C-alpha cells in the first residue's frame, strides 16, 4: 500500500449492526472509493450494498458490493466486526472463546487471499481479538490495530463536556487499558482547551470529586446501559471506526486511542494489545504515544494488562489456537 494511492479500498468482514453502521458512516463521510462487504449471510450483504449505493447521488462515487475473501488481496484496509454479539449480562471477556474461533477462520482466509494491507479489529473482546489477529496473520504488529479505547475516550470527552458546558472537541482526555471493565481514566492529563481539568474545575466549580467518580463509572458502564435498553451498541463505534479509517487512508499521522501492541512502553506491560494513544497513518501504527502515568494510573494499566494477558495465555495454551499462531 502507498500513502499516495488515490483509489482506497476497504473490505468489511461482518455485516451485523456494527458493520452495517460503519459502512453507512463510510458512505456519508465520503471515505474510500471502494467498499466490499463480507458476511456469511450473502443476501444481507447484497441488500446492504444496494441500499448504500442509493445514497451515492448525495455523497460521492464509490464502488459498493457484496465481497468474497478473494477480494481482500488488493485492499488497503480490512475491518473485522464479525463475531458473536455481547448479550445482556455478558461481559466482553465472556465472548473470548467463541469469537477466537470465528477470528481464526476469518483471518486465515484473508491472509490466504494475498492481503498485504492493515487489519482494523472491532469485534469484542477487541484487545484479545486484535492480539489473536496478529498471531493468526503473522503480520507485523504495526499493521494490526484494534479500535481499543477510541469509543471509551469519546464517551469520556462527551460526558465531561456535557458536565462543564463546553464542546466535546475542546475536551482532551483519554481512557486507557482494556476496552472493558478494567479500563481507567487518565485524569492526570485531562484538560479543557489546554487548562488542566482539576484547575478548570477549581476555577469553575462545575463538578465535585464524587461527581467525577460517578462520571467515569457511567462512561465505563455505558455499553451495559445501552445493551440493556436496545440490545447492542453500534452507532458510536461505527463512527469511531470511520475516524480511524480516515486517519489510515489519508495518512494523517493522527493521535488516536487504539489497541496497540505492548513491548515495555509501560513497566510490567508486555506481549498484549491494550488501549493507549498512538500515531496512526497509511502504514498502520507509526509509534505509540506514551503518556506519563502517575503511580495509581500505572497500577491500573498493569492490572488491566495482567487480566488480558491471563486470558490470552489460557486461550493460546489450547492446541486449536496455538497451532494456528504465526507470530
UniProtKB/Swiss-Prot annotation:
Pathway assigned in UniProt: Fermentation; pyruvate fermentation to lactate; (S)-lactate from pyruvate: step 1/1
Domain of life: Bacteria
Binding site for NAD(+): 18, 39, 44, 69, 83-84, 122-124, 147
Enzyme class, broadest EC rank: oxidoreductase
Catalyses which reaction(s): (S)-lactate + NAD(+) = pyruvate + NADH + H(+)
Xref: Gene3D superfamilies: Lactate dehydrogenase/glycoside hydrolase, family 4, C-terminal, NAD(P)-binding Rossmann-like Domain
BP term (GO), one: glycolytic process
Statement: the UniProt record of this protein carries the keyword Phosphoprotein: yes
A Pfam family matched in the record: Ldh_1_N
Compartments where located: Cytoplasm
Record family assignment: Belongs to the LDH/MDH superfamily. LDH family.
Subunit structure: Homotetramer.
PANTHER family noted in UniProt: L-2-HYDROXYCARBOXYLATE DEHYDROGENASE (NAD(P)(+)) (PTHR43128), L-LACTATE DEHYDROGENASE (PTHR43128:SF16)
UniProt-recorded name of the protein: L-lactate dehydrogenase
Amino acid at each position: 500500500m502507498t500513502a499516495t494511492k488515490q483509489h482506497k479500498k476497504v473490505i468489511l468482514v461482518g455485516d451485523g449492526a456494527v458493520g452495517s453502521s460503519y459502512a453507512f458512516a463510510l458512505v456519508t463521510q465520503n471515505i474510500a472509493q471502494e467498499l466490499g462487504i463480507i458476511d456469511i449471510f450473502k443476501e444481507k450483504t447484497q441488500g446492504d450494498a444496494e441500499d448504500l449505493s442509493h445514497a451515492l447521488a448525495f455523497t460521492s462515487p464509490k464502488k459498493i458490493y457484496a465481497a468474497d475473501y478473494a477480494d481482500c488481496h488488493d485492499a488497503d484496509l480490512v475491518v473485522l466486526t464479525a463475531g458473536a454479539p455481547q448479550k445482556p449480562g455478558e461481559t466482553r471477556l465472556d465472548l473470548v472463546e467463541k469469537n477466537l474461533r470465528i477470528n481464526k477462520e476469518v483471518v486465515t482466509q484473508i491472509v490466504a487471499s494475498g492481503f498485504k494491507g492493515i487489519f482494523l479489529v472491532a469485534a469484542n473482546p477487541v484487545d484479545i481479538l486484535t492480539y489473536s489477529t496478529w498471531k493468526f496473520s503473522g503480520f507485523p504488529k504495526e499493521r494490526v490495530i484494534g479500535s481499543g479505547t477510541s469509543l471509551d475516550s469519546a464517551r469520556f470527552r462527551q460526558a465531561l463536556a456535557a458536565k462543564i458546558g463546553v464542546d466535546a472537541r475542546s475536551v482532551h482526555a483519554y481512557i486507557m487499558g482494556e476496552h472493558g471493565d478494567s479500563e481507567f481514566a487518565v485524569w492526570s492529563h485531562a484538560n479543557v482547551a489546554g487548562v488542566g481539568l482539576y484547575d478548570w474545575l477549581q476555577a469553575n466549580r462545575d463538578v465535585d470529586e464524587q461527581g467525577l467518580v460517578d462520571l467515569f463509572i457511567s462512561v465505563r458502564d455505558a455499553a451495559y446501559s445501552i445493551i440493556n435498553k436496545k440490545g447492542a451498541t453500534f452507532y458510536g463505534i461505527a463512527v469511531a471506526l470511520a475516524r480511524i479509517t480516515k486517519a489510515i487512508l489519508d495518512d494523517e499521522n493522527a493521535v488516536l486511542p487504539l489497541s496497540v501492541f505492548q513491548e515495555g512502553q509501560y513497566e510490567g506491560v508486555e506481549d498484549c494489545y491494550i488501549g493507549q494513544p498512538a500515531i496512526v497513518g497509511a502504514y498502520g501504527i507509526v509509534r505509540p504515544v506514551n503518556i506519563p502515568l502517575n503511580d495509581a494510573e500505572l497500577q491500573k494499566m498493569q492490572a488491566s494488562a495482567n487480566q488480558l494477558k491471563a486470558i490470552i495465555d489460557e486461550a493460546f495454551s489450547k492446541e486449536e489456537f496455538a497451532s494456528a499462531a504465526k507470530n
